[in-house]
Regions:
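Small-residue (G/A/S/T)-rich helix-start motifs and N-terminal tracts that mark the onset
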Residues: 1-82, 181, 192-359, 363-380, ...
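Nucleotide and nucleotide-moiety/phosphate-recognizing core
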Residues: 36-129, 137-159, 346-351, 372, ...
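Internal gly/pro-rich beta-alpha loop/helix module
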Residues: 116, 122-124, 129-220
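Short beta->alpha connector loops
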Residues: 84-85, 108-109, 163-165, 188-189, ...
Length: 514
């Protein structure tokens, strides 16, 4: 599903007007769409009592059009004007021509005596107060009227955006209502899918208002959906063998972090990789082999418990037989581990190979100037906010306040696909394409889940999925696996190994429901 900022939506509308679409016609289509969506949801309500809160500007105009169509459909409609409309407002005039349609010019004195009781007894309340043009804090009659919506028992539907929700950032005003449904026009707005805005948007339905699809051809930001993920899934032909589904080389783990190596391999296998080989120290190999008999091994030479100077050449010599390299989880930051990372990334065999770079490999790179110049052209970097801060010489606070912008900027600057992990993980590529995960699941906030994610992305790359799509699909399946767990057990207690098992279930569900 494509997402737009407020400015992008204004530009699309301006282009539509330049092509001959009229503002009045667009508003009529939008308001009629709102009315039809409300009526569809109220078919089981005998009285269909509808309250419409109308603000200034186009959002209020959409509400007036919706009120007219709902009245004409037989609903009992009451309209509350929070501010005076223009004397020549054609949509308001059309409402006044209809008998038994109450229009109340609201003031603060009427909120408790008139609006609040109506809100409590309505089958549906339409928030058509403020839309993408909001730029000020809610106060006065706007704040007081919207606060009554916390008392509603019927369905609360927002027109384009819940009033007080920032279309670009998802920030919400303290008086912003939590809608059951948001009926947004043309394209969904970015802020509806970013926390905390997503928690106020409810179900988001995009209404077709007749815009030429060509006007949105350049939109490069999407929210991941099941349909998108299904389209990215690699095929599983019947006439196949393990080589068909990719050979993954994993370089991970150390004496202190054997579990990281296990989880990476497990993630790759559960994502469908045909063969997974772990290149690791003898102690790591021994630990993983007891848990994963499906994995093959390359034993790294060691000195004093860390990779020896020739460890990188051992792995590089084997890489021509592999389709993807995963590097970093649990390696630690010893001199030997850092030399292994730098040596591998400098190896000619790696330059044209898809590489997933995670955890300690990222921390190693962050210590060197212009580190990204040593990479090939097909890397996927998977930092958490702390690692992103180190890589970009920023702070965690800055990373978290500019997750989308920083992901895009760094993907372009580094020439690689970037996966910024966290609640609603962001995936960006050098061309500016951006994917946003719809999932924010605290069950994933546990050790080892990032290792599983890195492994799953590597497993998908090995099956021939392109880096941007592999990163997005890996993120989606990883989070969907956690959702399956949380639906049964709640938001805590999930183990990283259970996420890996859930990846195969999530993929099967996509295929089954497609």
């Amino acid at each position: 599903m494509k997402l737009v900022t407020a400015d992008q939506m204004r530009q699309i509308e301006a282009a539509a007007f330049a092509s001959g679409v009229t503002p009045e016609g667009l508003m009529e289509t939008a308001g009629r769409g709102v009315a039809q969506a409300v009526a569809t949801r109220l078919r089981g309500a005998p009285a269909q009592r509808v309250v419409v809160l109308v603000g200034p500007g186009n959002n209020g105009g959409d509400g007036l059009v919706a009120a007219r169509h709902l009245y004409d459909m037989g609903a009992e409609v009451r309209v509350y004007l929070l501010t005076p409309r223009a004397v020549d407002d054609a949509n308001l005039r059309a409402l006044r021509e209809r008998d038994d349609l109450d229009i109340v010019e609201l003031d603060e004195a009427k909120i408790a005596s008139e609006l609040a009781p109506e809100v409590q007894h309505a089958d549906a309340i339409i928030d058509a107060v403020l839309g993408i043009g909001r730029g000020r804090p809610l106060e006065g009659i706007f704040a007081a009227a919207l606060d009554t919506l916390t008392q509603q028992r019927g369905l609360l539907l927002a027109v384009d955006l819940p009033s007080g929700l920032d279309a670009d950032t998802g920030a919400v005003d303290p008086h912003c209502p939590a809608a059951d449904v948001t009926l947004t026009f043309g394209y969904s707005k970015l802020g509806l899918h970013l926390l905390p805005g997503a928690s106020h948007a409810g179900e988001v339905e995009v209404l077709d208002i007749g815009l030429d699809p060509a006007l949105g051809a350049d939109i490069d930001t999407e929210i991941m959906t099941a349909d998108w993920a299904r389209s990215a899934l690699p095929g599983r032909p019947l006439n196949s063998n393990k080589g068909t589904f990719g050979r993954v080389m994993v370089v991970a783990g150390s004496q202190s972090y054997t579990g990281a190596a296990t989880l990476c391999c497990l993630g790759a296998l559960r994502a469908g990789a045909g063969l997974v080989t772990l290149a690791a120290l003898p102690s790591v190999r021994a630990a993983v082999a007891t848990l994963l008999p499906e994995v093959t091994y390359i034993t790294l030479p060691e000195e004093d418990g860390v990779p020896a100077p020739d460890a990188a050449s051992v792995v590089a010599g084997a890489l021509p037989g592999y389709d993807v390299l995963l590097l970093g989880p649990g390696l630690g930051l010893s001199d030997g581990s850092q030399a292994l990372v730098r040596g591998l990334l400098a190896a000619p065999a790696v330059k044209d190979l898809p590489v997933v770079i995670d955890a300690d490999a990222l921390n190693t790179l962050a210590r060197f100037h212009a580190w990204h110049e040593s990479l090939g052209t097909r890397a996927v970097l998977t930092p958490h906010p702390g690692e992103m801060a180190r890589l970009s010489h920023s702070s965690v606070a800055d990373v978290q306040s500019r997750r989308i912008e920083l992901s895009r900027e760094n993907a372009a600057a580094w020439g690689q696909t970037v996966v910024l992990k966290g609640s609603q993980t962001i995936v960006a590529d050098p061309a500016g394409r951006t994917l946003i995960s719809p999932f924010a699941n605290p069950a994933l906030a546990t050790a080892g889940t990032g290792d599983v994610l890195a492994g799953s992305i590597a497993g998908l790359l090995g099956q021939g999925v392109e880096p941007f799509e592999a990163a997005g699909l890996g993120v989606y399946l990883h989070a969907a696996a956690a959702e399956l767990y949380a639906s049964e057990y709640g938001p805590s207690g999930l183990l990283a190994s259970e996420v890996a098992a859930g990846i195969a279930r999530a993929a099967a569900r996509l295929r089954r429901e497609g």
